[in-house]
Amino acid sequence: NSIFMRLSGYARGALVGRAHNVVRHPDMPAGLYRCVWDDITAGDAVSAYITNRSSDGGRYRVFATIVPSGAGFLSVRTLPMRTDLRDAVEAVYARVRQVETASDAAGASRREAAAAGQAALLEELQALGYRDSVDFTRRTLPDEVAALVAAGVGIPARDGDGPLARVLAEMNGVEVATADLVALLDECSRMVALLGRRSDEIGSLSARLKRLRDCLREAFADVERYGEVDGLILECVEQLHPLAGQVAELRSDVDSVRFGIALLRLHNLASGFFALQIIDGEDELDANDAVGSLRELTRALRDGAERLTERLALYHARGELVGGELDDVAEALTAIDRPLLDLLGSVPDAGADDEAAVSSVRLARSLVRDGFPEARHLADLAGAVRDLEVPYAAADIDARLVLVEAALAELA
């Protein structure tokens, strides 16, 4: 489109039908493109900070998001907003390029050098706190979209008649319908962080309860004396065993919802701005299949809307399940507190014949000195999971996309 031509410095005829290599900058590592290709061919969306080369040998930076679309792929590029992260990633690229250059010098083939670069890039991403390139996309796209919205980027309105005007009006309508969704990006981010902390806390709590059971067995020779308390602790341990994994899965669900919201808004913005460029005469309707491009953007928007519906259904189902489990564990922990303190208080601190037993009791007391604050944490988490409401007007968005598709059919 006109923006791509302006940034790259190429005329339309010099770009149509050409491979992306025409704007590839030598600073970009081959390992990145290998990661991109692996991810999109696996059906995943990909986001990356990319530096392109313009026709005069200069450079321009973009934040690219690529998704599978039909038999091919759809790429949307925006101005990088997280400049701190962009700079950190560009430093990573420079180090990865050094690995690839060293591989070249050692006689590696281009494919082998790219593989070495890909491995180095994935290690670098892990050092930045990302599991892999898919995790980078899942977390970075929402941040970039949230920053765009915070900067006031939105689809301008235009008065007018005709199919393109209707496309723009409906894309404005989708933007309005998803405004509350976009406002949830930060809330979802906080929920993801909270679920991560609680998942770690559950693991630590489980280990503490197991150690507590060991202490009771070492302190009391008579099983009947501690058996009731031990049974309560065992019940908690068994409830906690699957819960850490369930909370981690719920965290992934929230992450997925957050990503789905961001992708929906990205394709909404791209569709609206492309329609606007044609209306304003910046792009020609018949040039480079503009209608086909709008149709593909609309299809991506519809696919994203449908996937978000699926993501939300999964989150709500798992949230209800995990919320109930969290409540159960919180109640079980609260039920342990008094009987456990009574049991430990029945053993004198000194004077007993069995010093080993006294030592075990002291250790047990240290393990429960502050009680089980995790009970409150887990109960609060259950409430937070249930209280996360996602105002998604799926039917309204679908109806607007039907009108967009009808308008595009008139232009075909």
Predicted segments, located by residue:
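Sensory/regulatory domains in signal-transduction proteins
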Residues: N1-V99, V174, L181, C188, ...
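Sensory coupling linkers of modular signal transduction proteins
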Residues: G70-V153
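Charged heptad-repeat coiled-coil "rod" segments that mediate homo-/hetero-oligomerization
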Residues: E123-L234, E238
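Intrinsic-disorder-associated interaction segments
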Residues: G107-A114, Q118, Y130, G160, ...
